[in-house]
């Protein structure tokens, strides 16, 4: 049985800093992030350290990130979120599920009441909250947990109900991927009906779902004049849970299907399509760019060169989740399969602009992998920026919103030549 933990201990563990230095040497192209305004960063100490050194506590199942996410309560003023933080028991995944489900159901019921009274805006707001909280409850659950699928469906139902109350700021899209249908969402700025927008494709992380992405991170790109498409890839969201589709070692096939779709839209400038990656997408994004040449720029938070070395081995608590995502039978099979999930021999095929974000104290993705990617992508217009690892570890990405620098979004705006006036 794990020892009791104080809030101070949780914060201390969650914010532990890695400092095993590997002094970087810029090769050919300066690593200074020239296109980021006052947020410029230079390549220096990369970091990276063994998980047992970074976090002395016992890792939890469900992707292994529960104990990390406990530190986020300090960055919210939401009453329901603070209540969950106060009530959830340390090292207890069941408590995590119970407390998030409790506030989700509360908001779901409130939304039903407001809807019955014809108060559609308020009902929509509470359905959105319910969707968010159901998502928090369900994302750590493994495929074997009987609560996983019903919880995921409740999340989707709340999301759909919110859209029935008030017209959402996005449209639903369906992508034909090799005979399978991938569902997602497209969001764009305002502007003249005939305007064509530069467009961002999101390559999400292991636990991210398109519903959260289109309502969350998409907004900062739309505000800068870019359209945004969020689709759950195989290995994510609905394709994983409802269709049993897994992430392949060549995700450029998925990105190709999305670009093919975007080229059919009259409101998309197909000559200005960018691809962003977060977490596990920090590997998939550069891998896709090695083959999909219609992508004009790529940028990553937690860039990665080799998914096996940079994630599976670096952060053992996530191994079971990775096994599920790639469709392996067991951990040994996962390790064998992951030999193909690499940019070895391919990184030099990246020819577009590339920004590699990393966090020197990132506990989930090895920052050394970001540097290996930077070193190997010799034909890209490459840049590198610190403070862009997993968001629980640094103020730029995970601190109070007023202190965060929108480094990735501003860089993308410049690379895709977006017009902020059109937003």
Indicate residue ranges for each PLM-predicted region.
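N-terminal cap/lid segment of alpha/beta-hydrolase-fold proteins
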Residues: 153-191
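Short alpha-helix in the alpha/beta-hydrolase fold that links the catalytic acid
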Residues: 366-375
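Short beta-strand/loop motif that positions the catalytic acidic residue
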Residues: 350, 356-358
